[in-house]
Amino acid sequence: MDEAAGLLNRVDDELPWGNACRRTPGYLEVQRATCYGRLGLGVEASALWTQVLDHVPMTARRDRGVYLARHAAAAAKAEEPEHAVEIGREAAQIAVETGSARMRGELTALERVMRPWHDAPVGRELAQALAPVNERE
């Protein structure tokens, strides 16, 4: 990832594919945060998602919702289930508003990560927050 940042200026913008790294602000940091989360590095991923989301415009609803869902999963992996629910609630609201299948997939991943708390009050809060999303399926 560190080496990739130095190669961004070599991306051919004439291609109809493969230039998301030039079109998406913070693209490499999004990829880094995603990788950290999928590797189970919840603390690192959560911190990076906080930074990334500070720069995602509110108008980029679908991307923002996906990133929020990934941030919520990272918070759960960092053993911060209450924070995960707080973030997940915002992602769920965006998912209902947009109908994004990609976001629903990320929220399903959040549900899996939150399974250790499914019988706890925080788990029930998550289920309640995600209920409108699951109703749309």
Regions found by a protein language model. Give the residues of each.
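Conserved binding/catalytic microenvironments
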Residues: 1-137
